[in-house]
Amino acid sequence: MGIEPNILENKKRHIDICLNKNDVKSGCNFLRFVKLKHNALSDFNFSEIDIKEEIFGYNISMPVFISSMTGGGKEGNDFNKSLVKIANYLKIPIGLGSFKLLFKYPEYIRDFALKRYAHSIPLFANIGAVQIVEFGISRIVEMIKRLEVDAIIVHLNAGQELMNVNGDRNFKGIKESIAKLSNFISVPLIVKETGFGISPSDVKKLFQLGVSYIDLAGSGGTNWVLVEGMKGNNLNIASCFSDWGIPSIFTLLSINDSLKANIFASGGYETGMDIAKGIALGAKLIGVAAVVLRAFYDSGEDAVFSLFSDYEHVLKMSMFLSGSKSLSDFRNNKYFLSSYLLAEFGVFKQFYGT
């Protein structure tokens, strides 16, 4: 049985819309108001700089991962397969699109079970929090086992669902389901937002539920309410939420260093300098998605390799110019904030009680 044409068309429309970043980019991620400290007396060899990181038992080449994007249908599956192979070559983690589709079309599991192409890196499966409630813990756990992944991402995407005419409306029970899932799986559990961010208090709640890692996925990147609004020709409502959400930088600045060790940051991180600033602010890993999608669709695999080569060089240059040989030296003490950002962050702290 083939996948319903409307499902495939929806996925294709998502890709087409996301390829035009100016139409679906949300708010501001405030990274341009972070400045990295300059050290004119860096007294070591540039070749000594080490940006390798360890995560889930793997040594990865840099503190960057490719975030989950799409899956299902020939175009999405070919895209995922290509990216997994690229990620394996680069030695960086990668997340796959939601496997929700497999509960209706289990015969397509091979399109999602891509560990055979990811021997050297962590591979993440992905499912919505609502689907844990919908399909039950046991079925989710069994699917995770069949996919042979290294971790599971549970995404929170209420805004997108509420903007989708056929999206989910009942989110009752997601906290209990996340807590239960953490007790029944043998791989790390990552919870992520999908472009609206996670507040400091919600970060603490998620860790109390048993979550291993959190991807803040803040505002400033792809806004999925706008994506759904464009797909459904309903921008009158969607545009009201064009600047909704929490930039990941505000949450990073609000939580202590011990929590940051289990925090990923994403949401509008596109350049090597964006990545350098996110790491300097203390994130364990930085997630990139739409910028990779556009590079791949514009110019193919070579463009993706070039993108990550740039990331590596800019991160290393930033570390050298701030006097840092290692990521541990670079994190949390090599930046300062502009007066504008300090003022905005002050309002944030007052509003969110941090």
Curated annotation (Swiss-Prot):
Reactions this protein catalyses: isopentenyl diphosphate = dimethylallyl diphosphate
Signal peptide extent: none
Pfam families (alphabetical): FMN_dh
Oligomer status and interactors: Homooctamer. Dimer of tetramers.
Function: Involved in the biosynthesis of isoprenoids. Catalyzes the 1,3-allylic rearrangement of the homoallylic substrate isopentenyl (IPP) to its allylic isomer, dimethylallyl diphosphate (DMAPP).
Amino-acid positions noted as binding substrate in the UniProt annotation, renumbered to this chain: K11, K12, S98, F99, K100, Q160
Record protein name field: Isopentenyl-diphosphate delta-isomerase
EC number(s) reported in the record: 5.3.3.2
Chain positions recorded as FMN binding sites: S67, S68, M69, T70, S98, N126, K192, T222, A289, A290
Species of the source: Borreliella afzelii (strain PKo)
GO biological process, one term: isoprenoid biosynthetic process
InterPro entries hit by this protein: Aldolase_TIM (IPR013785), FMN-dep_DH (IPR000262), IPdP_isomerase (IPR011179)
UniProt GO molecular function: FMN binding; isopentenyl-diphosphate delta-isomerase activity; magnesium ion binding; NADPH binding; oxidoreductase activity
PANTHER family reported for this sequence: ISOPENTENYL-DIPHOSPHATE DELTA-ISOMERASE
One GO cellular component, as annotated: cytoplasm
Family as reported in the entry's similarity comment: Belongs to the IPP isomerase type 2 family.
Binding-site positions, Mg(2+): E161
